[in-house]
Structure formats: C-alpha cells, structure tokens
Amino acid sequence: MVTMKDLLECGVHFGHQTRRWNPKTKKFIFGVRKNIHIIDLQKTLRYFRYTYNIVRDASAQGKSIMFVGTKKQANETLKEFAESIQVPYVNYRWLGGMLTNFSTIRKSVRKLEIIEEMENSGQIDLLTKKEKLMILRKKEKLDKYLGGVRHMKKIPDMIFVIDVAKEKIAVAEARKLHIPIVAPLDTNCDPDLVDYPIPGNDDAIRSIRLFCKEMSEAILEGRELMQEEIVHADENSEEIEFVSNE
C-alpha cells in the first residue's frame, strides 16, 4: 500500500497556482510555496488508504470499475494499467452518452466488430480500393474512441477518473446515474463532485502513475479475495455434502 515516501517522491503534494484554486479544497491544503498550493500529505495518505480499501472491496464483490483519463500526461499510463488488469477505459476522448446512452455506444462497438469480421473473412478485399480505405479509416477512428470499452457489456459500477475538472462530461454522466467516482483531487477541483477523493496532484506523470498503480493493485487484491471466498465456499459445500452422506 502507498507510503508517505511514495507520495513525496512522486510530487503528489504539489497543487496548482494559488490563483487557480477551488476554495472548497481549503481543508486539504497545507500551505503555499512560491504561489503554489501545497497539499497536506497526511490527509492524502489517510484518504488514499481509505479509498484503496473501498476499491478493493468493490472489486471483491465483483463490481466493475472503469478508468477514465484523456489528457496527454495521463492517456498512455492509464491505458497501460487498465489493459494490464483488463478493465474498461477511455483514454482518448469521452464521447457524450458513453454512460447515459450506453446502448448507442454498444451499436458503435458492433460496427467495429463487423469491420473486423470483414477483414478476417477476406470480405473486405472484395471492395474497391476507395471503399476499403474508407472502411479502414472508420475502423481506426472507432478503435481510437471505443477500443477501451469494446468488451464492456454494461455500465460500470464505479469509475476512476484522472482530472475531474477536465473530464467534466464523464463526471456529470456518472453522477446522473449515481455511479460512485474515485479520483485524485487537485487544488483546482470541486470535491463535491467526487465520492471518494484522494487529495493530490493530477498533472505530474509520476503522480498519475502512482494513482493508476495503486487503484490497479486494489482491484487485483479484490479479485484475489473474491477467488478465496469462492474456494472457501466450495470447500464448505463439499464438507456439508460429505457429512450429510455419512
């Protein structure tokens, strides 16, 4: 689990310039240095560990968690961790209705699958060069926008967001559907929008990587707990059956 040393080394304590702050984050601020708000890492550590446990427990209950982060500093890191633990993600651009109009998103994913089926069967080679080029360009665009959610069959039970100020459409959709939001909370963000905030820098690459790493580990730990519970339940069932047959 995350330590104070991890937070310091990754620069999690550096907030935004004082003129860009959201006054609602006052309770998370330790002080000011060179017109930069410094986040109170004692509070960050406490919120981090609490939120880690929330995410772990959600995962242990079989709940699905989606990763969202489209800005340049975050998109590749977020994709790397999301793919490594096989959770849905959006790292290029949030399409309006990704959650609130999910059935339409599924139809777009189906278009991507149809194009891939055409490629695999060789059917695409029967088209003219111009038609083939148009379809392949469409496939590239669909994959860029929807590649991370193509295996998502239902809306997620929770979302982990990097930069709630930038991802305001995703946050608004999640709140509308009462989907809990987990997110690092920088000094320019509104804490009222996040169910499980972790006070910290959401711009520095090392900080973003730490957040993604810890949330991924929480999800994996939760899955292990769920498997242990299943094995334990099976053992109990076999024991009961053995006793009843005696």
From Swiss-Prot:
The keyword Ribonucleoprotein belongs to this UniProt entry's keyword annotation:
yes
GO biological process terms on file: translation
The record's listing under Pfam families reads:
Ribosomal_S2
Q: Which GO terms describe its molecular function?
A: structural constituent of ribosome
Q: Which Gene3D superfamilies match?
A: Glucose-6-phosphate isomerase like protein, domain 1 (3.40.50.10490), Helix hairpin bin (1.10.287.610)
> Which cysteines in this chain are paired by disulphide bridges?
none
GO cellular-component terms in the record? cytosolic small ribosomal subunit
Alphabetized UniProt keyword annotations: Ribonucleoprotein, Ribosomal protein
The record's section on PROSITE patterns has: RIBOSOMAL_S2_1, RIBOSOMAL_S2_2
Q: Which InterPro entries did the record assign?
A: Ribosomal_uS2 (IPR001865), Ribosomal_uS2_bac/mit/plastid (IPR005706), Ribosomal_uS2_CS (IPR018130), Ribosomal_uS2_flav_dom_sf (IPR023591)
Please state which protein family the record places this protein in: Belongs to the universal ribosomal protein uS2 family.
Name of protein: Small ribosomal subunit protein uS2
Origin species: Helicobacter acinonychis (strain Sheeba)
The gene coding this protein: rpsB
